[in-house]
Amino acid sequence: HTGGELHEFLLVWSLLTVALLYVPGSLVSGLLYIGMITWYAGVYRTGSWHTVQHPWLYLPMLAVVIPAYVRELRRNGSSTGFFWFNAIAAISIAIGSQLFWFDGHLEVALGIMGLAVAFCLVPLTYRSRTVRTGAWPFLGGIAVLGVLFFLSYHDIWTEIKREPGDHLGPDIWPLITMLAIGIVTYVLALRWRKPMQATWFPESLVIVLVAYGLAYVSIPVATVIINAWLLALGLHTVITGLHLDSLPRMNLGLAIISVTIALRFFDLDINDALKGVVFIALGIGFLFMNMRLLKQRKMATHA
């Protein structure tokens, strides 16, 4: 009874799968359902390049899975299955949230940052540390860094000067929604987390909003703020990694600093040999810091 389009087929099967979320209510049916509605939303949005179609049905279909998610959280919050449930849900929301823009704007980065910060703070909404929610901050952290690196280029900010203030049109609504999600989540998280406690990733939303406001006055100032924040974020991550004796976290901080420096060197018209020297120096820095942490571990073991 469908018209033969793929998105119609996926919609029908998604609706047929809804009952399996609660009878018998298996975890596999939840994973299948989330995957189906995400596929449907993507196909519906990209099915035509001539007309813009937004997958509005994706939103109520996503809401249907919330009771099943809460049930699995209470029953199997520390299980591997729930980890994958979280991972698929996070990926679905990350993809689905980007299907409601009419056009590409600088402000899209602000919306992505808002949602990314909310992802980073998801683990704080659970009192139990045994709940496996690692997929949310992982994806959120990637998105935060992606937006910061994107905004670290001077030319990106010139769109503010080219376009009038009302150029967003209908895109203002998904922008406001995603920003509101990030701001509300950040404010609610203050009950359990002080500003800049443990990680500085959530504060990136504040920095980006400040830089966006200042860009209307001075684009170079906005660019400097983003680059300075990237270096500070990387340095803090390195220090935290050393303090916690964590190689992955320390290397993440080194990577943030190195990528920021490398990107700025690509902006400069300098000799390729000098660029090569810089990359070698960055590699030596990675090696030195890793050897330092390993030595620190060895000394702690013999102490």
Q: Which residues does each predicted region cover?
A:
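Alpha-helical multi-pass membrane segments and their bilayer interfacial helix-loop junctions
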Residues: H1-A303
